[in-house]
Curated annotation (Swiss-Prot):
Record bears the keyword Transferase: yes
Pathway in which the depicted protein is active: Isoprenoid biosynthesis; isopentenyl diphosphate biosynthesis via DXP pathway; isopentenyl diphosphate from 1-deoxy-D-xylulose 5-phosphate: step 2/6
Catalytic activity: 2-C-methyl-D-erythritol 4-phosphate + CTP + H(+) = 4-CDP-2-C-methyl-D-erythritol + diphosphate
Keywords (A to Z) from UniProt: Isoprene biosynthesis, Nucleotidyltransferase, Transferase
Site positions for Positions MEP for the nucleophilic attack: R150, K206
GO MF term list: 2-C-methyl-D-erythritol 4-phosphate cytidylyltransferase activity
Site (Transition state stabilizer): R13, K20
Native source organism of the sequence: Synechococcus sp. (strain CC9311)
Protein name: 2-C-methyl-D-erythritol 4-phosphate cytidylyltransferase
Enzyme nomenclature, EC number: 2.7.7.60
Function: Catalyzes the formation of 4-diphosphocytidyl-2-C-methyl-D-erythritol from CTP and 2-C-methyl-D-erythritol 4-phosphate (MEP).
Amino acid sequence: MHLLIAAAGSGRRMGATRNKLLLPLSGQPVLAWTLQAALEAESIHWIGIIGQEIDRSEILTLVEGAPKPVAWITGGDSRQESVSRGLAGLPDTAQHVLIHDGARCLASPHLFNRCSDAVRSGKAVIAATPVTDTIKRVDASGLITATPNRAELWAAQTPQAFSVDELRQGHREAHACGWTVTDDASLYERLGWPVNVLDAGPSNIKVTTPFDLTVAAAVLAERLG
């Protein structure tokens, strides 16, 4: 299985002046935990790291001596463009691909393997978790306009797993039509293609704020004993 890791994270919401994935977390950079899980996942045979050139040397230091092939792919100005470049950088033999946010540093090897198994069976899948809060739809003035049925709501996460040919087609359509999406599953939705959810459990958080770092450190402390 081929894995693309989006690693061009901004530090803006962290109050940091550098890539948040290079901030320390329990003794090593955030991204190192993501890479460790990917390298331990039996299903993953090739990893592409999509990042910005300014971070290239520091990120590649994290995978020196890695037991699997790891390639560097220079990203674009948006996540969508970066993933498109990542798809262009896949080996010719790639049939399926997992897309993963480097900031989801608590993803387990088992989660990568589950997503890999699902996409090999012919399903496009995304890691997700059922929403537990009551969600409100709110207009521009701050007025609540609706309360969606919580039973139908899931928070989309990564890894997201797809056919390489289909996902490339989705990105071509997005470019041609001017679509802007925040995850790759949205391209499938626009094209009317089915995507399934795979329950990732409660710990597959995305590290975005200082509070998220605190939560991630607590989860890692529990895992590591």
